[in-house]
A protein has these predicted regions:
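Sec-dependent N-terminal signal peptides
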Residues: 7-13
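Acidic, surface-exposed loops and disordered segments
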Residues: 20-234
Length: 234
């Protein structure tokens, strides 16, 4: 059996980066112990990823924290390279590993590959023009009735945002580029996406995430600012 993901890393990193693996016996023991939590399908998925971030020790790819720090928004994509279906599936699996309020998992994902559809999104959405040049886009949608009472219904925004971050990090880990372009809460943008993608009532698009192989390499920004940290109280 190939290297096995340390389940402790998977569960602790809400930003599940596809393919982070360990070969230590402790990792295997943890994977078996957490089998009831992770499930057979998820365990096989995380242990079998070969294209993305494989392991810290092989020296070819970054560890989790480095991957988080080096992720950047990509707005230009290589038109000649098609994103493999296997990578798209891994990205979506990573998205569905996100946390959600009361484990309601209110998300739905529309994978857009049709060039005409991508062009429509780019034309109708001011922040999503880059979708025209992308190989695909994932539109993250949430259920407006997630089964939670009162203001809890609004938690779909948090849940789908967590899933969206997983998408960005998984894409980065698989050698792809992606960018989060906002839809919600703009009413005109929401209406446009509903129309183009035939999104049913009861669901709202949070964003459009164009994805493809990068055709640019912008500098990584150092966003660390200790002045933003407050100890015990503001």
């Amino acid at each position: 059996m190939s290297k096995i993901v340390t389940v402790g890393v998977v569960l602790a990193a809400a930003l599940t980066l596809v393919g982070c693996e360990k070969v230590e016996n402790a990792g295997r023991k943890a994977a078996r112990k957490a089998g009831s939590l992770v499930g057979r399908g998820s365990t096989e998925f995380f242990s079998g990823v070969g294209e993305g971030i494989r392991t810290v020790s092989d020296g070819n790819v970054p560890d989790v924290l480095t991957a988080i720090a080096t992720r950047k928004s990509i707005r230009k994509f290589d038109p000649l390279r098609t994103v493999e279906d296997e990578k798209v599936e891994k990205i979506l699996k990573a998205a569905m590993c996100a946390p959600s309020a009361m484990d309601k998992r209110p998300w739905e994902f529309v994978v857009v590959k049709d060039k005409a559809q991508l062009q429509k999104l780019g034309e109708r959405l001011p922040y999503s023009r880059v979708a025209n040049g992308a190989q695909l886009a994932i539109v993250v949608c949430g259920s407006l009735d997630n089964g939670l009472p009162g203001r809890g219904k609004e938690y779909w925004i948090h849940d789908c945002s967590a899933a969206s971050m997983n998408i960005l990090l998984a894409a980065h880990g698989l050698g792809l580029g992606a960018v989060w372009t906002g839809v919600f809460p703009g009413e005109e943008r929401i209406a446009a996406v509903r129309e183009i993608l035939a999104i049913p009532d009861g669901y709202a698009p949070l964003n459009v995430i164009p994805i493809g192989y990068p055709a640019e390499d912008p500098a990584v920004k150092d966003k660390w600012n200790p002045a933003k940290i407050h100890a015990d109280r503001w």
